[in-house]
């Protein structure tokens, strides 16, 4: 009862938003949160980390996080020095800023690699996508090179699975799925999807009814990169007899759709851990519920057993073998189309 009471209090809005109740051991204290406008933090007096010097030294004395709802406004604010720091700047805006000599005198620009990846989630519950050959076909319709070169302007690298290449248990033997329209067509045909009526869209009889290969691609509105990924997929898919409808959803609606599994394809991203990866949150069947993160319906008894064993294994050599087996299972099932790991696009005022 006491622990339940503590949990309810700890997770309540009061402990997330009210001054005096938001506490921690970091260098700043919470001052104010105006929803949709800003969050203010002040540097603590007599903070323990100041005595250590070096990387733990905290500055400046005050931080204001401004909520800016579109990048056009944010870039204007940067140029006007109304913002001191911005990260995740849109690639095209970032290139323009790099070419702006006046801006470069005021700001330092960085492109550090991110420990994250962008992917397309495929709804395995959808009868159109239940066959792994169809999911493999869709993967062959994604041109990662074009995405990275034309949408990210080279500021990213392709990924082939859920484990970052910097990890010692990354399986470099898993093959990249090449962009190949003809291979996609062949896989669709093998799975029984062909254009039988000449309308340009592959179809198949499913449970006695004719079903066409029409898929919705959902992304969070305002994210131009994800929108354009959908447009590129739409153009490529059409050549293979797959009709893709690109659909924007406001962020909260987008999340709710993925929770309810109300999607065919969605574009998402995961931030990865610098420590040992724990696949359970995303890939275990116990996470396959509305509040869980296994939103593509991946997994079975074999993969669950492997994940459970992996989490309990202390021997590094054995654990690395299990990680590689896990990556192989994911690759064979194709629940995601893994796209790229982005570089962050960061501007920091030169006075810092």
Where on the chain are the PLM-derived regions?
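Extracytoplasmic
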Residues: 23-25, 36, 58-60, 80, ...
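Ligand/substrate-recognition segments at binding pockets and active sites
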Residues: 35, 70, 77, 91-92, ...
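Gly/Pro-rich hinge or "lid" segments in bacterial periplasmic/extracellular proteins
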Residues: 1-57, 62, 72-73, 181-192
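Ligand-site clamp/hinge motif
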Residues: 13-20, 47-96, 234-235, 243-245, ...
